[in-house]
């Protein structure tokens, strides 16, 4: 297996030959190389928290090179800025420069959650987002920033806002 394989989120376009019922086509998966196996490991999402999928600890080995080539790479879940105005259906438009959170459906369709300034000087992202097409992913610019942990658990160390997974 090539060591140039990129760890990250993918959309399956074919069922995984080794486990077609567990990993069907059109599914969001996390694919990672590990030190334990010469082949990438395919991990399924196991839940959503704050518009972000979490992934389990166990996965399926992907031994089929053609299957790996069929995967569609997806941008990481996290926070982005719109680089242009974006129409999200029914005439609704989101302005250029808007802070959004990117997530996915279980079948790996991209969803954006617009940020909204709330009382108390906080930004909130809705629990329901707007589906966007793959081509519209090009209108997102990643935001890299850090925030302090909540006061109850705060030490003073900053934690990444995390564009992880």
Model regions and ranges:
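Extracellular/lumenal glycan-associated surfaces
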Residues: 7-14, 76-85
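Basic/aromatic-rich interaction segments and small domains that mediate binding to polyanionic partners
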Residues: 9-55, 89-131
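A short linear-motif detector with a strong N-terminal bias
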Residues: 21-22, 58-61, 79-81
């Amino acid at each position: 297996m090539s060591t140039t394989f990129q760890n990250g989120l993918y959309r399956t376009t074919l069922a995984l030959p080794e486990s077609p019922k567990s990993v069907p086509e059109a599914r969001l998966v996390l694919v990672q190389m590990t030190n334990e196996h010469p082949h990438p490991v395919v991990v399924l999402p196991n839940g959503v928290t704050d518009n972000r999928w979490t992934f389990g600890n166990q996965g399926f080995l992907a031994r089929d090179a053609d299957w790996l080539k069929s995967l569609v790479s997806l941008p990481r879940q996290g926070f982005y800025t719109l680089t242009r105005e974006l129409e999200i259906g029914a005439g609704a438009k989101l302005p250029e420069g808007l802070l959004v959170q990117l997530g996915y459906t279980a079948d790996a369709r991209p969803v954006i959650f617009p940020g909204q300034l709330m009382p108390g000087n906080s930004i909130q992202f809705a629990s329901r987002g707007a589906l966007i097409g793959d081509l519209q992913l090009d209108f997102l610019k990643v935001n890299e920033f850090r925030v302090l942990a909540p006061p109850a658990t705060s030490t003073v160390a900053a934690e990444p806002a995390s564009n992880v997974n």
